[in-house]
Amino acid sequence: PQGAVLSTGKIDRTRCTTCGNCAEACPTAALVVQGYSVTEEMLFQRVTKEKVFYRDGGGVTFSGGECLLQSEFCAKVLRRLKHAGINTAVDTCGMVERKDLEAVVPFTDTFLYDLKAIDPKVHKRCTGAENEQILENLTYLNKEGANVEVVIPLVKGYNLGEWKKMLVFLKNLERIRTVKLLKYHGFYFSKYEALGWEIPAT
């Protein structure tokens, strides 16, 4: 309806409003909407059905995208999971408002915190965003005594020169106990192709 689906079969993402009408109208089902809406109760019931698998340290991880962009919803479900005795984790890049973290801290056993760069220019070049809020939120979690596992993806040509700076920064956060360096992988290639994006050279 917005002219986002072109005659070539490609999609102009700048025109897409994510209404889903094109997928509904597609006669061959070549266009599909990924994902669906759930209520707090629906998600809680679905997750607790699997409770038997959460023994011996297993649990539920909220991730995304950025799950804390829906922090109020996450907090409600996390609270119920904690009361049900299920271990909880939140995977975040930290690019959220402080109130979003504050909402989930009491109900989160572990934070998986992505850290991509210390130098703000490098971070902006890699992600398109500044990192001041990310570093401030990580410092906040440290002060709160949260259990944080820092995850650092290393990509040649992007942030490989940042890893020492990141470790120096983390050394000053005395409660951070775990840091994982992740080697670059191509798991996201299929997502880029589905979106019609060019896969960056590495």
Regions found by a protein language model. Give the residues of each.
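Conserved AdoMet/S-adenosylmethionine-binding subsite of the radical SAM
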Residues: 41-194
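A signal for specific C-terminal beta-sheet/loop modules enriched in small/flexible residues
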Residues: 7, 23-24, 53, 141
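Inter-heme linker and motif-flanking segments adjacent to c-type heme-binding CXXCH motifs
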Residues: 4-7, 31-34, 53, 73
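Cysteine-centered iron-sulfur cluster-binding motifs in ferredoxin-type domains/subunits
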Residues: 1-2, 10-29, 66
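Short glycine/proline- and charge-enriched loop/turn segments
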Residues: 193-201
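Poly-acidic low-complexity segments
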Residues: 6-7, 11-12, 50, 119
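Short N-terminal micro-motifs specific to bacterial/archaeal maturation
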Residues: 7, 13-17, 34, 65, ...
